[in-house]
Structures are given as C-alpha cells and as structure tokens.
C-alpha cells in the first residue's frame, strides 16, 4: 500500500482529507496522473522463519528528494507471533470517492495463519503508523465460520471485505468476511450462508459493472 502525502493517500493517492471529495480518484486516468507516492507500507513476514518474532509493517521512504530515500524509516511490530500477515487493504478507496465523509486513514492487515485482523492507524502519523485495533480470531470464527484470511478490500458501502481460504476446522472454504469500517466489528459474511466456494484466494470487484471476480488457491 502506498501513500503520496502526509495528509492521506494510497491506492492511487487522494486521502480525502480536503473535504471536496472522498478518497482516491474518479477515474483510472486521473489516478495515473496523480502525484507519486512518498511512502509505502510493506508487510514483513517472520512467521515460519524460526525466529519466534512477530511480523511487522515497514514504512519505506520513496521520496527522491528525502534524505531517507529508499530507507526503512519505521517498523510497527505486531503483538503476536505466527500471524503471517498477507494482502493488506484500506478502510476506504475510490469506491467512496463521492462520499466527502470518508478518509483513507486505516490499513487492514488480515492474517493467513491465525485469522487475526489488524487495523493500523496511518492517518495520525503516516511516517510512524500505530496499531489501532485487533480483531481476534474468535470473533471471526463465531460470526462467519471462516478462517485463513487472505485479501482485504474496501467497499463503497463503508465496509471492508476480506476473503477466506478455509474454515475453523481446516476445510477449504472460499467465503467473504464483512467488517464495519467505523466500529471495526465483524458483521458476518457477504456471501449467503452455505454459498461458499470450495476454495478461496484473491478477489476484486468492478462496481460499475456489478461484477466480482474471485480466484482459488
């Protein structure tokens, strides 16, 4: 995930902090012509390395005019080991461009190994993000019967959707967890109960065409 300015950004820039529009850009062409990123956030995985240390989120300075160009300027360590952070996503994106109340200031980090979900505050101090919320696996299991969380994407509805690969018992199950992006409580599943795919993996959607495409591991 990327952030072009101190005020917001990521996934094509535009944090939505100006009050004239929501986050992101109205079109892909506008995104291509937007300002370049100054910071990027990189999940760093120590799970399975034998170090018994938690994964962390690295902040990298990618501003060519900065004295810290191409350097890791901050590391946010997770509170638990063996999480295996995976495909991160924002709390709000271009799907909310028309909503002036939305701001891209939270980074969502699902975990493959533990099914935990971390929510990181990138808005208060983009150079040194902090842990905002931890959604424990028990809440995910009890409300969705899904596990092994893979990819997080924000929706125009103000929710965050996270794909799953399996269930609590180790079976393959491709479903979608819905999280409220204001309260950060698990709401349930986007798919109807019993309507999961045999396997899950990545996904993306195109709201203008009312289409969602998902893949399997």
Language-model segment annotations:
Residues 45-47, 110-112, 122, 165-167, ...:
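Short loop/turn segments immediately following the C-termini of beta-strands
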Residues 49-53, 112-115, 168-173:
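Short, solvent-exposed loop/turn segments at conserved positions within beta-propeller repeat blades
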Residues 122-207:
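Asp-box/WD-like beta-propeller blade repeats and closely related beta-sheet repeat scaffolds
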Residues 57-62, 120-122, 179:
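Hydrophobic/aromatic beta-strand positions that recur at structurally equivalent sites within the blades
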Residues 32-45, 57:
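An edge-strand/N-cap motif at the start of beta-rich repeat modules
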Residues 69-154:
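Blade-loop segments of beta-propeller domains
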Residues 4-9, 15-36, 84-103, 142-157, ...:
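Structural signature of eukaryotic scaffold interfaces centered on beta-propeller domains
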């Amino acid at each position: 995930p990327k952030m072009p300015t101190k005020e917001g950004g990521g996934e094509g820039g535009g944090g939505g902090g100006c009050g004239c529009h929501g986050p992101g850009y109205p079109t892909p062409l506008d995104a291509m012509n937007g300002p370049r990123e100054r910071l990027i956030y990189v999940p760093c995985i120590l799970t399975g390395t034998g170090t018994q240390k938690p994964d962390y989120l690295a902040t990298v300075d990618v501003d060519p005019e900065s004295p810290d160009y191409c350097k890791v300027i901050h590391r946010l360590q997770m509170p638990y080991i063996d999480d295996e952070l995976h495909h991160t996503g924002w709390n709000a994106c271009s799907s909310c461009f028309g909503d002036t109340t939305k701001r891209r200031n939270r980074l969502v980090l699902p975990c493959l190994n533990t099914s935990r979900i971390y929510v990181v505050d990138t808005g208060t101090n983009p150079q040194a993000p902090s842990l905002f919320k931890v959604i424990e696996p028990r809440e995910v299991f009890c409300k969705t019967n899904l596990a092994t969380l893979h990819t997080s994407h924000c929706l125009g509805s103000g929710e965050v959707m996270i794909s799953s690969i399996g269930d609590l018992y180790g079976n393959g199950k491709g479903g979608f967890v819905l999280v409220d992006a204001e309260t950060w409580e698990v709401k349930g599943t986007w798919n109807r109960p019993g309507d999961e795919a045999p396997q899950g993996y990545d996904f993306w959607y195109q709201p203008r065409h009312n289409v969602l495409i998902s893949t399997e591991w």
